[in-house]
């Protein structure tokens, strides 16, 4: 992501008939410490805005590649100065609402935890959060274990890690709520859970800024 535009980055989260406009830093700064490329984002306001028309596939505005072998291949993608993330149609990816580890810096490991860990049992059904297309289905022994990456038509990509089994294949189109894997304990983990990430052009966004997990809604 190029910082030439990030200072004026405006993200709108469209949900339930209104948009929440995020003009910069609270979305990113509250995640601190974050990737050094994002530390210069301007201070923000959160406001309601009228619903607006959106593209059928806003992700086409962002991504210029389709890499099926890496979770994080992005180097040059740029987000428009104003971009609407349509959160309508969200499906809770797990049967559980229990977040066991939150997004943020982990002093004990000296690294960022760039997603949420949600309690699941091995074999629990994991579903796609939105409509989209499967980009990656792989195994990462030192990290995600069995994982799936889905690019959604709203511009987000979601990552589902530590699965016991993947139920989808690369280039498969999926609907929100459609099973994509089974919960598990593969990869670098200390117990059965789902590691869930939300990213825009490769940059992690705290899923709890987007979704209300206790309510299983946006």
Q: What are these regions, as identified by a protein language model?
A:
Residues 2-103, 218:
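Polar/charged, compositionally biased leader and regulatory segments
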Residues 80-85, 98-127:
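Short glycine/threonine/proline-enriched tight-turn/helix- or strand-capping micro-motif at secondary-structure
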Residues 97-99, 124-134, 174-177:
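Generic structural motif
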Residues 100, 119, 133-135, 164, ...:
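Conserved positions in beta-strands of structured domains
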Residues 103, 122, 138, 164-167, ...:
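A generic structural motif
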Residues 106-108, 123-125, 139-141, 185-188, ...:
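Short polar/acidic secondary-structure junctions
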Residues 111-114, 128-167, 197:
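Zn2+-dependent peptidoglycan hydrolase active-site motif and core
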Residues 146-152, 170-218:
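Conserved, short, structured surface segments that act as functional micro-motifs
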């Amino acid at each position: 992501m190029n910082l030439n535009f990030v200072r004026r980055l405006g993200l709108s989260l469209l949900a339930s008939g209104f948009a929440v406009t995020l003009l910069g830093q609270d979305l990113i700064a509250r995640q601190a410490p974050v990737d050094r490329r994002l530390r210069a984002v301007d201070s923000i306001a959160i406001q309601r805005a009228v619903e607006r028309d959106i593209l059928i596939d806003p992700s086409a505005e962002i991504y210029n590649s389709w890499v099926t072998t890496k979770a994080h291949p992005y180097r040059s993608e740029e987000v428009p100065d104003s971009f609407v993330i349509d959160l309508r149609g969200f499906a809770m990816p797990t049967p559980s609402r229990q977040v066991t580890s939150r997004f943020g810096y982990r002093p004990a490991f000296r690294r960022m935890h760039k997603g949420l860990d949600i309690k699941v049992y091995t074999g629990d059904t994991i579903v796609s959060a939105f409509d989209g297309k499967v980009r990656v289905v792989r195994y990462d022994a030192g990290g995600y274990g069995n994982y799936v990456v889905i690019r959604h038509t709203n511009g987000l990509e979601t990552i589902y890690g530590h699965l016991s089994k993947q139920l989808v294949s690369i280039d498969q189109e999926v609907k929100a709520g459609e099973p994509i894997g089974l919960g598990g304990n593969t990869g670098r983990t200390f117990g059965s859970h789902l590691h869930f990430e939300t990213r825009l052009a490769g940059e992690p966004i705290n899923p709890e800024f987007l979704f209300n997990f206790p309510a299983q809604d946006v």
